[in-house]
Amino acid sequence: MALPKTLESVKFPVLLWRKGYSYVARDPVALCTHPRSLVEDTRRRSKEGEFMMADAGGRIYEVGEFEAVRPFGGITRIAHFLLRSVFAAPTFRSDRQPEAPEFCGIIGDAVRGRFGKTFAAEVAAAHTPQEAIELVQKRDRKAG
């Protein structure tokens, strides 16, 4: 199956966040695969405007909804199918591409609650959007 059209111009990895939650998705399959028990909550929260997303290319997206999509991702989708995961891709209300310092500050603010002020300041001081997202991705892996 093909990649959902809403993700064709998104540069991965991406950071998806809302108040009290952040998640780094390394690829479209990681972003669009949801445990069956959580997909309705994710869809409700996105409709209420709680989710934002940032990509490694420096774009900030306001997530409008997570819409069900056909499974994609080649052989990896089989594992998700066996785990009874649901595929849902984000649609966007709007997107913008702020300058790098503003972008990095937004990302720092987004992860402050999860990783603390010191790390948020480190992310905000990143020189490029790619660097900011990679810092969060590394910390996310360590945190588990």
Q: Each PLM stretch: what is its role?
A:
Residues P4, E8, W17, C32, ...:
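Compositionally biased amphipathic helical and low-complexity segments enriched in hydrophobic
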Residues S46-G144:
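Low-complexity intrinsically disordered segments
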Residues A2-D27:
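Short, extreme N-terminal segment that most often corresponds to the first beta-strand
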Residues M1-A2, G144:
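Solvent-exposed, charged interface segments at domain starts and junctions
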Residues S22-G57:
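Short, flexible N-terminal segments of the mature chain
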